[in-house]
Amino acid sequence: MSKKVLVTGADGFIGSHLVEHLLEKGYNVKAFIYYNSFNSYGWLDTLPKGKQDQIEIFSGDIRDTNGVREAMQGIDMVFHLAALIAIPFSYHSPDSYVDTNIKGTLNILQAAKQLGTERVLVTSTSEVYGTAQYVPIDEKHPLQGQSPYSATKIGADRLAESFYKSFNLPVTIVRPFNTYGPRQSARAVIPTIISQLLSGMEEIKLGDLRPTRDLLFVEDTVRGFERISCFSETIGEEINIATQSEISIGDLANKMIELTNPKAKIIVDEQRIRPSKSEVFRLFGSNEKIKSLTDWETQFDLSAGIQTTIDWFSDNENIKGYKHEIYNV
């Protein structure tokens, strides 16, 4: 009998891809989506009807203790991805990040403890490391709260750790580096660049071009989640999902310009630059741990992942909801 799994944040970018991947692997999937009066299931609405019919939808709010407990009834394993993630928005609305990212994670952990859930995977972020003090960044690297967003994710990670150590809850903290691919929000750098280029703009507005990122294609990310969940050795661990490589934002932008509109040039837009102490200047992750504990390997190099992403955005049906002319926060 297949395991019944809950994916929180299933209506979002990574969550919707994870739902698809788990369905392909034969799991019985329940999707926790954010309640809204439009009955929108987010990116799940774009899946083929055959896939949609296989998904059990639960509309709720991760901040609501009772709703979370109800959603987790009868669940063998939970992949907790629901979170607020936009860094600029966290500067002026930090309360909402505490409520969603910390309290939401606590709700998942409490329900799992009470219900005896077999496995809990809590999603972290490479942002918790802050600017690299050494590379490649392994799981022992110090954590630095360089934004309200990353501070709340550090808090959520430590709560997850505490439930493992205090109550022996079978928790794993999964820490993907910068994931990109089809369906990603325009607040992220790759969709920002692509949507401007495909609109015909010849002046591409970006922030600081110097920071480097370890860019992970979404299919590698979700496969990492699934493989981590399959090995008991990962319980109680914090595990990076990374390519163990890096590229600067400037070089990344130039790569996409070459592929789509060679006449375009980059313009630095001051409003897109983070406060100097908040900017994470280098992220370059180690993937030694995930490789030692599981059978995961990257399958997409950057060129293949970027081309797949550009191809998806090139479909008018996909790009029509993106507002390339504004700064998406």
What is the meaning of each model-derived region?
Residues D208, G236-I239, G250-A253, N261-R282, ...:
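C-terminal "lid/loop" region of Rossmann-like NAD(P)-dependent oxidoreductases
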Residues I154, T179-T192, S199-E202, V218-E219, ...:
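Glycine/proline-rich active-site loop of Rossmann-fold NAD(P)-dependent oxidoreductases
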Residues L18, I193, F225-S229, A253-M256, ...:
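Hydrophobic "lid"/C-terminal helical patch
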Residues R63, H92, T100-K103, S147, ...:
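Residue-level signal for the nucleotide or nucleotide-sugar donor/cofactor binding architecture
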Residues P182-R187, R210-V222, E238-E258, R274, ...:
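Substrate-binding strand-loop-helix patch
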Residues K49-I55, F167-P170, I194-K205, F231, ...:
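A short C-terminal helix-loop "cap" of Rossmann-like NAD(P)-dependent dehydrogenase/epimerase domains
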Residues M1-T179, I249, T308, W312-F313, ...:
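N-terminal Rossmann-like NAD(P)+-binding domain of SDR-like oxidoreductases, especially those catalyzing
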